[in-house]
């Protein structure tokens, strides 16, 4: 096994372990605007847009979840079935975001799939959030692995250090994961291109 592959595998293992710890131990809706991201993700595959999954309602629950002392019931959060969610149909909706150049929100796609699968398994806040976190973690790991494979060995340390500040977000439904992967991919290509003497040296891969 090459030195580069060993380095990649070791780092991915560390990220996986950190992500799994965060997945199971991070308090519900406490990982940076999770109420907002959960509401956006849910709406991507919703037919009736239940009030219980609206941004307003999830923000209210998030405020309770991050308050001191903690006032949210973990058992109820995971175990209580939401009737309106159980009765909701599945319809794909294109989400928009005026802050994006394309105006189309693609950053919530993977957590949206996670929430959809979560509500099909058991329509509770906890199960949906757990599934969304899991899918974003898988997306992050897969994306970073592909980026690392394409990167030169001397760029890996830079990318790994760059990853550290975002570690707390890798198991959350946030669109920050999508943005981070885009920036990491851009950084990898930029570092590669900056070392070329002429444009014709660009590898055709």
Model-derived segments and their meaning:
Residues 130-153, 185:
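Transmembrane-helix motifs of polytopic, lipid-linked glycan transferases
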Residues 115, 144-149, 183-196:
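Hydrophobic transmembrane alpha-helices
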Residues 6, 123-126, 145-165:
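Transmembrane-helix signature of polytopic, membrane-embedded enzymes
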């Amino acid at each position: 096994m090459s030195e580069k592959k060993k380095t990649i595998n070791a780092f991915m293992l560390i990220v996986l372990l950190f992500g799994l710890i965060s997945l199971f131990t991070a308090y519900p809706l406490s990982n940076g605007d999770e109420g907002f991201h959960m509401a956006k993700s849910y709406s991507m595959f919703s037919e009736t847009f239940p009030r219980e999954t609206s941004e307003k309602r999830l923000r209210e629950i998030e405020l309770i979840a991050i308050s001191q002392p903690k006032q949210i019931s973990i058992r109820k959060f995971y175990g209580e079935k939401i009737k309106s969610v159980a009765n909701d149909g599945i319809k794909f909706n294109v989400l928009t975001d005026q802050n994006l150049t394309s105006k189309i929100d693609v950053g919530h796609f993977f957590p949206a799939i996670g929430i959809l699968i979560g509500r099909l398994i058991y329509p509770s806040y906890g199960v949906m959030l757990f599934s969304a976190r899991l899918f974003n973690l898988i997306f992050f790991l897969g994306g970073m692995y592909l980026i690392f494979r394409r990167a030169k060995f001397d760029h890996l340390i830079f990318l790994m250090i760059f990853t550290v500040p975002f570690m707390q977000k890798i198991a959350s439904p946030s669109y920050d994961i999508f943005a981070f992967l885009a920036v990491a991919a851009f950084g990898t290509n930029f570092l590669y291109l900056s070392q070329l003497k002429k444009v014709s040296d660009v590898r055709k891969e």
